[in-house]
Amino acid sequence: MKDQPIGMFDSGVGGLSTLRDLRALLPHEDIIYYADTGNCPYGGRSHEEIVALSERITYILLERGVKLIVVACNTATLHAVDYLREHFSISFVGMEPGIKPAIAQTKTGVVGVMATQATVAGERFQRLIARYAGDVQVVPQACPGLVELIEAGELQSETTRDAVARYVAPLLKAGADTIVLGCTHYPFLRSLIADVAGPNVALLDTGAAVARQTQRLLAAADLLNPQTSQGSIEWLTSGDPAHFAKIRQCLEIE
């Protein structure tokens, strides 16, 4: 089983930011990445829809013999990972907004969270805030439209800049000195968000932490791939493969 691939999925290209972190830490692992671009974005979908889509993709990855699945999507994690863990015996690594580390480092006592509508509205997200916030004010900001702009490859357009400015403004007004990028798509806008937010605001995402957790789980199960050559990546998508390849190129993902 050591030479079996790691499975990853996201609503689209957002999980590629996590794949980048995973490749940096585990370069010898083979990966199968499923982009559900035919159903993207997940942010406006119901809990039931997100669970059903996540379950369908899990079956697809299991048919290809993966040894672990990374749910490289905050929205799918918050809505579906509990269900997946209950119904499948394989290990899942999920994405959750980095609320805990953000709360630990804020100086102003205000943390902003940029996320999809479905993430912000989710019960698990509210539980995270209740569990870790304490005296810190956590300000959620739903960002409809950002995922679609990234999926279209508009990383530096005026439309994207205007959208980022619109979503960051309430967080700055509230006094946030730390902003959590609570969607795997958003790290691809890190430079733009940093430019809008200014030098005194820290940006956090959890891609590197997810890569480390994946490494820990594989090591504990003695499933780390012993090969010394660079691992392969197989790309799967429910949408247009040519467009998916074009966006990968735009995002500088092999």
Curated annotation (Swiss-Prot):
Residues annotated to bind substrate: 10-11, 42-43, 74-75, 184-185
Active site: 73, 183
InterPro entries: Asp/Glu/hydantoin_racemase, Asp/Glu_race, Asp/Glu_racemase_AS_1, Asp/Glu_racemase_AS_2, Glu_race
Pathway membership, UniProt: Cell wall biogenesis; peptidoglycan biosynthesis
Family membership noted in the UniProt record: Belongs to the aspartate/glutamate racemases family.
UniProt cross-references to PANTHER family, sorted A to Z: GLUTAMATE RACEMASE
Main function: Provides the (R)-glutamate required for cell wall biosynthesis.
Protein name as annotated: Glutamate racemase
Annotated source species: Herpetosiphon aurantiacus (strain ATCC 23779 / DSM 785 / 114-95)
